[in-house]
């Protein structure tokens, strides 16, 4: 099915990471073009090579630290310039955090890591991509987490950053609606390399967590999360904004 995204320019932060790689493949199937940003060049360049090899995609890459506003502005403007001043979709995927620490075990540095790499980075990318998104009547897809919605123990800084992203996204959906910019939030549970390593280390805990998912598995970055993102960026979702989409196999259900 043609989702109407051929030749659309998609900016993805954390573009070399595992979840991003799946999302990129989903958009590449639709004929999209890419601006990839990341603080780590290795994974990003590997993603570029994969997209060019497997799909013939046009890919522009640039190193940027999302917590530094000047670097974000430079990356956004350079990417847009490469594609003749165009950005159609912004996907804020990048996030780092300390995990497994109780609230009182967190240092300020631990908290800063989550907030700066997630909340501030999302803010900076949205702020500087806005003129291009306004011109294209584009879409923003921001990543949050069930960690904040469900109050998961050991994830206070991560949850704080992600809930901040959700709140900011809803405000942007209200403010940018008159510009025909859609802003939505995705909360995924995805099988990643880190999760596979955890399964090897603690198989019993892994099985316990998987059994808490009604559909009985972790999501696939391309087929599950990526396809939801494709929908949210497509004309089919033109009347969807300010919403949080739980891509968690039913584990995100709340009364």
Where are these regions (language model features)?
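Active-site helix of classical SDR
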Residues: 126, 161, 169
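Residue(s) in the substrate-gating loop at a strand-loop-helix junction
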Residues: 145
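Short, small/polar-rich loop/turn modules that mediate ligand/substrate recognition or access, typified
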Residues: 177, 182, 240-242
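Substrate-binding pocket helix/loop in short-chain dehydrogenase/reductase
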Residues: 101-103, 107-115, 209
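Short C-terminal tail/terminal secondary-structure segment
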Residues: 100, 150, 211, 229, ...
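Canonical Rossmann dinucleotide-binding motif of NAD(H)/NADP(H)-dependent dehydrogenases/reductases
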Residues: 3-35
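Catalytic Tyr-x(3-8)-Lys segment
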Residues: 104, 204-223
